Amino acid sequence: MERTLTILKPDCVRKQLIGAVIDKIERAGFRVVAMKKTRLTQETAGEFYAVHRERPFYGELVEFMSSGPCVPMILEKENAVADFRTLIGATDPAQADEGTVRKLYADSKGENIVHGSDSAENAAVEAGFFFSAEEVVRVD
């Protein structure tokens, strides 16, 4: 079983779409093995997105991700990383396929409802950023 990390971003929480997005995730065959609601500080958001520090959108991303509560989750499924990225769609909702999370719910490239890990290796690192081993519940 592969795992991936997702974050339901502040726009998702603000628009009261947590349940709708989790429903799509579970209907797609993913199991939620860890989940919490938290609020990132600018410092914490900056650490999480440090890989983008030199990108022009970094400051806006950090500001947005610290603007309200978010819901990080670890999801489990065969081929979890690729399947989840397919489920959520392109970063820009205008480019996302019909029926994807971002096409359905996102307003813009910057406020696009959800983060999804881009590799199994990054998923493991990102999951460790939010969750201790004790917080991950094995689903059999």
UniProtKB/Swiss-Prot annotation:
Q: What class of enzyme is it?
A: transferase
Residues involved in ATP binding: K9, F57, R85, T91, R102, N112
Record's GO cellular component terms: cytoplasm
- In the record, what terms sit under GO molecular function? ATP binding; metal ion binding; nucleoside diphosphate kinase activity
Q: Report the domain of life of the source organism.
A: Bacteria
Its quaternary structure?
Homotetramer.
Q: Which PROSITE patterns match?
A: NDPK_LIKE
Q: Which NCBIfam families match?
A: PRK00668.1, PRK14541.1
Residue intervals passing through the bilayer: none
The entry's function note states: Major role in the synthesis of nucleoside triphosphates other than ATP. The ATP gamma phosphate is transferred to the NDP beta phosphate via a ping-pong mechanism, using a phosphorylated active-site intermediate.
* EC number(s) from the headed UniProt entry: 2.7.4.6
UniProt keyword terms in alphabetical order: ATP-binding, Cytoplasm, Kinase, Magnesium, Metal-binding, Nucleotide metabolism, Nucleotide-binding, Phosphoprotein, Transferase
Q: Which SUPFAM superfamilies match?
A: Nucleoside diphosphate kinase, NDK
Q: Which reaction does it catalyse?
A: a 2'-deoxyribonucleoside 5'-diphosphate + ATP = a 2'-deoxyribonucleoside 5'-triphosphate + ADP; a ribonucleoside 5'-diphosphate + ATP = a ribonucleoside 5'-triphosphate + ADP
- Set out the biological process GO terms recorded for this chain's protein: CTP biosynthetic process; GTP biosynthetic process; UTP biosynthetic process
Spell out the family assignment given in the record's similarity comment.
Belongs to the NDK family.
The cofactor(s) it depends on are: Mg(2+)
Q: Which SMART domains match?
A: NDK
Query: Which cellular compartments is it found in?
Result: Cytoplasm
Q: HAMAP family from the entry? A: NDP_kinase (MF_00451)
What is the name attached to this protein's record? Nucleoside diphosphate kinase
Organism name: Chlorobium limicola (strain DSM 245 / NBRC 103803 / 6330)
UniProt keyword annotation of Metal-binding present: yes
Please state the protein's primary subcellular location. Answer: cytoplasm
